[in-house]
């Protein structure tokens, strides 16, 4: 009888241990691209300060002809950009989704980029989508004066389901 009781207790402890490990692992895997972010942190980069979005309106550049890649971070679309070299500054924000607080600020930023990069539409898109960024979507950097902020997505975030196309040709 005593060995049965010990076996039951051992089984309960194993289950609790597995559960505790899963909780700890989930806390470490905060963001959708946490493994990639961790790799950059190990190279000495710092995670920016982030806050809750609290249902902030978001505007994002999109590819009007290919929405599937419109909600992927820069470094996921082009992984070679995340490799540190002397040419380019690597930033953890490359694993976040770039958004703006206002449509006119997004358009102004796009026009500024277009002056220096003729084919900007190939890199970041040719349209604008908008939606509400909720606390369930992830955390954001504090919006800059130009309205830009980065959304570090939680694993279940999918803006393609909540954002709608506003402008299909910039």
PLM ranges: what are they?
Residues 19, 27-91, 170:
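ADP-ribose/NAD+-binding catalytic cleft of ART/PARP-like enzymes
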Residues 152-170:
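Charged phosphate-binding loop/patch that engages nucleotide di/tri-phosphates or the phosphate backbone
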Residues 26-27, 35-43, 104, 111, ...:
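Polar/charged alpha-helical tracts
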Residues 1-27:
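Short, Lys/Arg-enriched N-terminal segments with co-localized hydrophobic residues
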Residues 47, 83-158:
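ADP-ribosyltransferase catalytic core
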């Amino acid at each position: 009888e005593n060995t049965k009781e010990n076996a039951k207790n051992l089984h309960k402890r194993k289950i609790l241990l597995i559960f505790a490990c899963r909780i700890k692992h989930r806390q470490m895997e905060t963001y959708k691209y946490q493994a990639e972010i961790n790799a950059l942190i190990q190279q000495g980069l710092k995670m920016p300060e982030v806050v809750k979005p609290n249902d902030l309106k978001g505007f994002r550049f999109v590819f009007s002809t290919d929405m599937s890649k419109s909600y992927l971070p820069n470094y996921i679309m082009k992984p070679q950009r995340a490799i540190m070299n002397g040419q380019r500054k690597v930033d953890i924000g490359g694993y976040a989704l770039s958004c703006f607080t206002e449509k006119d600020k997004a358009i102004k930023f796009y026009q500024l980029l277009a002056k220096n990069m003729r084919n900007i539409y190939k890199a970041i898109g040719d349209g604008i989508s908008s939606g509400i960024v909720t606390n369930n979507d992830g955390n954001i950097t504090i919006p800059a004066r130009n309205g830009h902020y980065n959304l570090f997505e939680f694993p279940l975030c999918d803006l393609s389901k909540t954002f709608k196309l506003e402008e299909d040709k910039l």
